[in-house]
Amino acid sequence: AQKFAKEWGFEKAYGSYEELVSDPEVELIYIATPHPFHIEHAKLCINHGKPVLCEKPFTVNAVGAKEVFALAKEKEVFITEAIWTRYLPSRKIIGDIIASGEIGEIKGISANLGYDMHTKERLIDPKLAGGALLDVGIYPLNFASMVLGDDVEETLSSCVKFDSGVDAQNSIILKYKNGSMASIQSSALTGTEQYGMIYGTKGYLIAE
């Protein structure tokens, strides 16, 4: 750590995560460790009063996420998922277009993201929470959440798996209580168009 810090000009380096969270000069911690360790490291930071930006996926399942949020609420410590697409200028542009009514009432979205990543060991290792969904499927799911919200009534999904058991590619349909639908695909086998489409009663919008 000291060698890396010296090479890249960092003022400090730490020998452990415990040493990091114990430093009173640290104001916020960005968690970018492998997926299965997010919950452990998030709790460590929260218990030491450190605000957290946690890389996606926030945790590997809903149970873990609820535990982290409950602890953050109890300790009154800020934490959020560091998914950068939520903070792009295009997010506001899309929101403004929808709010203007230019494309009418939103009835559905489709989104996909895929890369050829089948040779990356981390992506196919179940012990590291590998698979297309948790690595790249997060982004089209986030797109659906930003546009349609989270009031999902029904979920349908299917996937093709690697020999290791994690998903190689998947397709998800979300049905919302207001009648809208989202169709989402992600893949660790092939590249895709990598765009999202929003369908309204007066037109549609393409987000690339």
Task: Name each model-derived stretch.
Residues 1-8:
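NAD(P)-binding Rossmann-fold cofactor-contacting core
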Residues 9-17:
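Conserved SAM-binding strand-loop segment of SAM-dependent methyltransferases
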Residues 12, 27-28, 108:
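Short, Asp-centered acidic motifs that coordinate Mg2+ and/or phosphate
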Residues 14, 53, 78-80, 110, ...:
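Structural detector of well-ordered beta-strand residues that form the stable sheet scaffold
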Residues 21, 28-35, 39-86:
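Beta-strand-loop-alpha-helix segment that lines the small-molecule cofactor/substrate pocket
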Residues 85-156, 163:
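Predominantly a Rossmann-like dinucleotide-binding segment in NAD(P)-dependent oxidoreductases
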Residues 142-208:
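Contiguous beta-strand/loop segments that form the cofactor/metal-binding neighborhood of enzyme cores
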